[in-house]
Amino acid sequence: MLTLDKFEEASEKVKEVTLETKLIYSDFLSDQTGNKVYLKPENMQFTGAYKVRGAYYKISTLTDEERAKGLITASAGNHAQGVAYAAKCYGCKAVIVMPTTTPLIKVNRTKSYGAEVVLYGDVYDEACAKAYELAEKEGYTFIHPFDDLAVATGQGTIAMEIFKELPLVEYILVPIGGGGLATGGSTLAKLLNPKIKVIGVEPAGANCMQESFKNGKVTTLPSVNTIADGTAVKTPGSNIFPYIKKNLDDIITVEDDELIVAFLDMVENHKMIVENSGLLTVAALKHLGVKDKRVVSILSGGNMDVITMSSVVQQGLIFRDRIFTVSVLLPDKPGELAKVSQTLADVQGNVIKLEHNQFVTTNRSAAVELRITLECFGTEHKEQIIAALEKKGYKPRIVRTMI
């Protein structure tokens, strides 16, 4: 059972290995949403995510015999690092089963804490089944990433810190994968203030908790499809579901495109790297439907590999109309490219890529296609560039940007 005294005990325990991350007031997000928005930056933890809270507290509740057997878990990344680091602190062996799709940074960081990593399956649920199999075969003690009350208690210590710093908080947004943080966070928040609103946020492509809420029971999704790999879970926790059903006020889902834009917002306005799952609570702010409220968004982690980061930045710039590609047809004769270039230069269009296709028509003397990828200042500047091309007699056509 989740009780206030257990949360208080866990809060003291996790101080041994965690930072008490301080709330950051966001002028940008406050202006965007009409609320007073604060960020709880758990991406600043030593392990890059909040998960070490639940892992460390759970291991502290085990017997010496259970720890001596060695620990095993399954994780898409952040719980893996939490268990690996906590096990290292306790001097325990740790085996971590991770999906084959786990970002390289999370795999390498997990190994760096001394854990043995087994890559198996495409999603968390498949990795979890493998971990249970190995636990039974080798006698390891299994540490569930979310469907465990001790783990949820450790995760819930975040709410204790939020109330300590912002006692009059009115809304807390929590990301949901399997539901551990939502369980601990919402339960403790309601114990501290029954009137507070706690909102869960899931990826639209992995909304297992939302479906479970609708059906009134734990529901398994047939598949998941989201860039938020840390919350790509098919089945939420059955042991913790009753707590979530009781204490969570609502669930919001967000699209991958919204996460991409949120990533750019955090980089440009807060100079912070937050992984896609951690951005759920930022992207959800515009769907909250309230004004003039004190809102805390929990940034659950910041473990993102550089390749993914690069892709997200590029896509974000495209969504923001900061990068776009335009196609024009022009005669295949000397000087035509120079004319187009001058037209773009006159309106400060910065060319970053050119593709010249002579085979777009059967008569290349009549027309060749020029595809120009440009960097600009935003939608208004993009429209100015298009207008300048039209004024010169071209018929510009916006096409998909491929970088």
Q: What do these predicted regions represent?
A:
Residues 1-403:
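PLP-dependent amino-acid enzyme catalytic core
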